[in-house]
C-alpha cells in the first residue's frame, strides 16, 4: 500500500513519515491563554524536532448543555488564529460546523476539520472539500473504520485529495469509548493510504449518564497514546491545559501542560523505533 503525503505548510504528513503533533487546547478560552499554550507547544516541539500544528476550536457547537461555554465565535477566533500564525509561525487546524464557515475559516487556517458528529453530512463535506483546504475527518464514534472510505470518496469527488483521517474512539455501550487498535490500518487501506492520526485525549472521554459535562481519564493518556503510536501513525492529536481541573471544556481528558515535554519525548521515541522496523507482510 502506498502512503499518501499531505502537505501542511512545510510539513509532510504521512503514515511512514515522522509523526506530526496536532496539539493545543480544546476551545479558545482567551487570547492570552491561546498564546501561552501555543508558545509551550512550539518550545517543546522545536526542542524535540517534532513537526507541529496548533489546534483549538472557536466554537464548540456540540456541547451537551445550553449553558456550557462554546468559545469566542468565528470572527474573534480567526483573529486569534491569525495572531498565533504571525507570532509563532505555526500551522493551525480548527473545526467547522456550518457551510458558511468553510470559506472564511479556510482562508486563515491550514486544515479544516470535519467533526465526528457531522461526518455524514454531505452538504457540509462538499462545501469543505471545495475550499481546496486540507481536511481532517474525525471518525464518528458510531461508525466502523471501513466506512471512512465513503467519506474520503465524497471529498475526492469534489476534486480534493488532501485528506487526513482521525480516530477518536468508538462507542462501547452507553457513555464510554474504546479504541480499536486494528481500526487504524483498516482506515489506511480503505482510504488508499491517507494519513491516519489518533486523537488520544478525546478517546479518554467517559460520561455521567445523567450529567451535562464529559468526564475523562487523563491519568491514562500516556498508556493509550503509547499504544496508538506503536501502530505507526501519521500523527497524534492532543489537548493540553495549564490547569485541566478548571478548563472550560474537556479538562478531565486534557494532559497537564507541565507534562508536555516528557509526554512528547516518549511519543517521539516510540514513533522513531516503530518506523525503523521493516514492514512484515503477514497476509500470505
UniProtKB/Swiss-Prot annotation:
Main subcellular location? cytoplasm
What EC number(s) does this enzyme carry? 2.5.1.55
Localization:
Cytoplasm
Report whether Cytoplasm shows up as a keyword of the record: yes
- What Pfam families would the database entry show? DAHP_synth_1
Q: Which UniProt keywords apply?
A: Cytoplasm, Lipopolysaccharide biosynthesis, Transferase
Question: Which Gene3D superfamilies does UniProt cross-reference here?
Answer: Aldolase class I
- Give the source's domain of life in one word: Bacteria
The catalytic activity, as recorded, is: D-arabinose 5-phosphate + phosphoenolpyruvate + H2O = 3-deoxy-alpha-D-manno-2-octulosonate-8-phosphate + phosphate
Record carries keyword DNA repair:
no
Pathway noted in the entry: Carbohydrate biosynthesis; 3-deoxy-D-manno-octulosonate biosynthesis; 3-deoxy-D-manno-octulosonate from D-ribulose 5-phosphate: step 2/3; Bacterial outer membrane biogenesis; lipopolysaccharide biosynthesis
MF annotations from Gene Ontology: 3-deoxy-8-phosphooctulonate synthase activity
* This protein's GO CC annotations: cytoplasm
GO terms under biological process: keto-3-deoxy-D-manno-octulosonic acid biosynthetic process
Give the matching InterPro entries: Aldolase_TIM, DAHP1/KDSA, KDO8P_synthase
Q: What class of enzyme is it?
A: transferase
Of which family is this protein a member? Belongs to the KdsA family.
Name the record gives this protein: 2-dehydro-3-deoxyphosphooctonate aldolase
Q: What is the lineage of its organism?
A: Bacteria, Pseudomonadati, Pseudomonadota, Gammaproteobacteria, Pasteurellales
